[in-house]
């Protein structure tokens, strides 16, 4: 069916006309299955006799041959595709009819409306001819502006190259080397953005109160990085620690022997905080050395043990307590027994020697409390050293079993003395010093 539009003289074909003569292939004859339904259900071989097979005849049941399902597209899917095609054609035709019947706009009406709207801005903007006259009447007398350039003033201006280098950070230069005091209100506006108004101040601005340094996190690899930064061997570092502590101990001993006349020898040394901080650094450094393969040498462990003994002596000297000597028979014995030392301790701990202990706020009491809180670090280092010594002994035993004589025949620095005995003497010395400090605090 065709419809004619009187305005556009177009011919539209309706969907019914498109479906009037569908082209369909001729129906094909149905093909029967080779097996009957009974044999196919029983999953047995069918002899394919028609109209009744021998098996169905023997069993006395009805033999039925159903139609064979042709492989490929199903009939219902084909019908569904045809329906979708018809619906799409109907939608396309409806859209075409809607576009043809839509009324055409009247541009004459819109032009008049636009002209009316433009008349509203007629009084706002100045006409071009009047604008040109106004520009010609406006003149500037540049003679009124006297620009004086004094060479001395120009020379006193800051060099821009130095300012540029101040804000450009070198890849190798640390960020904390920039001095905040060189930044003035007239320089680096982008850096000073967000700070208080300083237009009426001519002095330099101190940015130290505004710049916050982010806290540095201690990563697990910081200890390994610390070892890599120290280029000296672990043995050299341990010997340097021993030399440093020997000088400190000698200096304190000389001061206690000579002493200045008229001074109170029982006052707290001024460097107690420095002694505690330095001992912490040394203990941490020796703990890091134990993580290196150099600590497999017992000679290094013995030197570290002597350093730990020097640290205990330094703590005891800081609070004027004579350190307890090692026990008889050890590798570091000084031929002085603990029995000879106990009367001296009782004499030093008496209130007659320290009359200021009765006040409870004397410097020696505060020093004793500070030292007592640091002894656990020495104890932890001794435990790590003992564990390392056991690991080295196990490695030597395995080396002797495997025939590695270079490992098994290693002779320590202190011949005839194992690190275990030295570690036991150090623990005795540490325990004795702890008891003396506790007794001193209780006697106060």
Swiss-Prot record:
Its main location: nucleus. GO terms for biological process: aflatoxin biosynthetic process. It comes from the Eukaryota. It is found in: Nucleus. CDD domains: GAL4. Residues 36-63 bind DNA. Residues 1-31, 326-348 are annotated as: Disordered. One of its GO terms (cellular component) is nucleus. Keywords: DNA-binding, Metal-binding, Nucleus, Transcription, Transcription regulation, Zinc. This is Pestheic acid cluster transcriptional regulator 2. The gene is ptaR2.
């Amino acid at each position: 069916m065709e419809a004619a539009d009187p305005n556009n003289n177009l011919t539209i074909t309706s969907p019914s006309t498109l479906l009037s003569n569908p082209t369909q292939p001729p129906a094909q004859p149905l093909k029967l299955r080779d097996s009957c339904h009974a044999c196919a259900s029983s999953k047995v071989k069918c002899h394919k006799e028609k109209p009744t097979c021998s098996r169905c005849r023997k069993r006395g049941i009805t033999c039925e041959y159903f139609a064979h399902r042709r492989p490929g597209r199903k009939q219902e899917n084909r019908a569904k595709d045809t329906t979708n095609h018809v619906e799409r054609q109907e939608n396309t035709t409806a859209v075409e009819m809607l576009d043809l019947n839509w009324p055409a706009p009247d541009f004459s009406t819109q032009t008049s409306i636009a002209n009316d709207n433009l008349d509203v801005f007629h009084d706002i903007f100045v006409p071009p001819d009047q604008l040109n006259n106004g520009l010609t009447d406006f003149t500037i007398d540049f003679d009124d502006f006297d620009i004086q350039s004094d060479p001395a003033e120009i020379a006193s201006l800051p060099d821009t190259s130095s300012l540029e280098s101040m804000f450009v950070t070198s890849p190798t230069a640390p960020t904390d080397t920039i001095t905040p005091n060189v930044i003035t209100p007239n320089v680096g506006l982008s850096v000073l953005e967000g700070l208080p108004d300083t237009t009426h101040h001519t002095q330099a601005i101190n940015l130290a109160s505004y710049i916050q340094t982010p806290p540095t996190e201690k990563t697990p690899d910081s200890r390994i990085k610390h070892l890599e930064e120290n280029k000296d061997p672990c043995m050299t570092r341990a010997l340097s620690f021993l030399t440093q502590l020997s000088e400190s101990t000698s200096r304190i001993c000389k001061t206690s022997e000579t002493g200045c006349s008229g001074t109170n020898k029982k006052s707290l040394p001024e460097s107690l905080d420095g002694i505690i901080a330095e001992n912490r650094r040394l203990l941490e450094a020796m703990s890091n050395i134990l993580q290196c393969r150099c600590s497999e040498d017992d000679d290094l462990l013995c030197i570290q043990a002597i350093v730990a003994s020097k640290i205990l002596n330094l703590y005891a000297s800081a609070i004027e307590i004579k350190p307890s000597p090692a026990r008889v028979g050890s590798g570091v014995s000084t031929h002085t027994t603990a029995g000879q030392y106990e009367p001296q301790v009782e004499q030093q701990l008496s209130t007659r020697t320290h009359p200021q202990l009765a006040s409870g706020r004397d410097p020696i009491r505060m020093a004793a409390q500070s030292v007592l809180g640091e002894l656990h670090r020495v104890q932890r280092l001794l435990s790590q050293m003992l564990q390392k010594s056991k690991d080295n002994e196990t490695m030597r035993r395995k080396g002797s079993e495997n025939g590695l004589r270079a490992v098994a025949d290693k002779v320590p620095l202190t011949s005839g003395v194992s690190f275990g005995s030295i570690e036991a003497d150090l623990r005795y010395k540490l325990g004795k010093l702890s008891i003396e400090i506790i007794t001193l605090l209780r006697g106060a």
